[in-house]
Amino acid sequence: MKNKVTKGLLFLYLVSLMIACNTKKSEPAAVIDVEQIKKEIQAKEDEFAATYNSGEAKSIGYYADDAISFSQNAAPHVGKTAIVEYLMSNIDSLNKSNEISFTTKEVFVSNDANQVVEIGYYKVVDATNTPVNTGNYMVLFVKRDGKYVSLREMSASDMPVE
C-alpha cells in the first residue's frame, strides 16, 4: 500500500513538473519589411513636397487631425488645421520659385508596424538651385485606416543664424 501511494505521489509530481515546465510555443513574429516602410514614408515626403511646392498646402493629407508640429522660434502648432494654416502662411511669404525636398535617412519601426519614427533631411533651394535653408527633422507616424499619418513632427535648420 505504501509503495502504491509513493508511486502515485511520484507520478503526480512528475506530471505536475512536466506541465509547469512546458513552454508555450510562441507564434513567429510577423516579418516587418523596414526597407518597404522606408520607401512608403519617402513617397509620403515626396507627395508632401510636391503639394507644398505647388502652393496647395490645404490639400495635404499628411497629418493626423490631432497632429502637433514643433517649429523653431514658435509655439507648437496643434491640430491639422493649425498646421496647414501655418504652412499656407509660409507659402505666402516665401519666394514662389523656392522648392522644398525631403530625404528619409532612417526609419525606426515598432514591432507591430503601427508606428514609425522617421529621421530625415530637408532642403529648400531657390530658382538657381542654391540652398536657402537646410536642416533635419523627425516625424512620428502612426497607422490609421491603413495609412501612415504624421502625429508629431519637429525640425531644426542647420543653416547659420543671420
Predicted regions and their residues:
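Generic short beta-strand segments
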Residues: 119-125
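A short, structured loop/turn motif at beta-sheet edges
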Residues: 107-115, 129, 142-148
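Bacterial Sec-dependent N-terminal signal peptides
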Residues: 1-32
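Polar/charged side chains located within well-ordered beta-strands of beta-rich proteins
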Residues: 45, 69, 90, 104, ...
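Short beta-strand edge/turn micro-motifs at domain boundaries
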Residues: 134-161
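Short, low-complexity N-terminal intrinsically disordered segments enriched in polar/charged residues
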Residues: 21-62, 162
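Sequence/structural signature of outer-membrane beta-barrel proteins
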Residues: 125-127, 159-160
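A solvent-exposed, acidic/Ser-Thr-rich amphipathic alpha-helical stretch
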Residues: 35, 40, 56-114, 121
